[in-house]
């Protein structure tokens, strides 16, 4: 879809997680986005998806108890509403429709990256224990499975704000 021009390249952050947003201590409001070395042309769904992977999960990225891992649809809804409204009508209908798939894709991609790092000796992601990246991989793939099961609800949420 990107190659045939239906999904435009946008300026994307490519590391959209909460710790890359400076928050004002007094107001609790976002001040600015940081860690700009990853900014480049990309797909909106990927930025949205990475933030959902991080922000709508019910568990930490390295949770060992996989029964705690799921995508919180309320958090997905709140974020989707803010994201779509915050884009001020700039997104195409197809870009908006692809947002849930972006969440699944980016979660899967990160799971594979954690597994690759584990298999290659844990040289890229900092680890705190033996098997840490393998735990991260399992958590991400469990989250992917849950997102796939919830895809109809995620699509319905997105349609509300389209």
Stretches with model-predicted labels:
Residues 1-13, 18-32, 126-134, 145, ...:
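ATP-dependent phospho-/nucleotidyl transfer catalytic cores
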Residues 5, 19-60:
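Catalytic activation segment of kinase domains across protein kinase-like and atypical kinase folds
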Residues 8, 13, 40, 103-108, ...:
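Secondary-structure capping and boundary motifs in well-ordered enzyme cores
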Residues 45-89, 105-124:
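Active-site activation/catalytic loop segments of kinase-like enzymes and analogous catalytic loops
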Residues 91-103:
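All-alpha amphipathic helical-bundle segments outside canonical DNA-binding/catalytic cores
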Residues 109-162:
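ATP/Mg2+ or Mg2+-diphosphate-binding catalytic cores
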């Amino acid at each position: 879809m990107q190659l045939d021009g239906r999904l435009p390249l946008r300026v994307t952050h490519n590391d959209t997680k909460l710790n890359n947003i400076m928050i004002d201590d007094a107001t609790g409001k976002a001040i600015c986005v940081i860690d700009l070395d990853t900014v480049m042309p990309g797909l909106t769904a990927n930025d949205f998806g990475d933030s959902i992977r991080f922000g709508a999960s019910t568990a930490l990225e390295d949770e060992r108890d996989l029964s705690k891992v799921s995508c919180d649809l309320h958090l997905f809804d709140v974020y989707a509403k803010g994201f779509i409204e915050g884009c001020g009508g700039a997104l195409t209908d197809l870009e908006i429709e692809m947002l849930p798939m972006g969440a699944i894709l980016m979660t899967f991609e990160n799971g594979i990256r954690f597994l690759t790092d584990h298999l290659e000796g844990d040289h890229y992601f900092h680890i705190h224990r033996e098997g840490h990246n393998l735990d991260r991989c399992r958590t991400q793939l469990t989250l992917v499975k849950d997102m796939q099961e919830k895809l109809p609800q995620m699509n319905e949420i997105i349609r509300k704000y389209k």
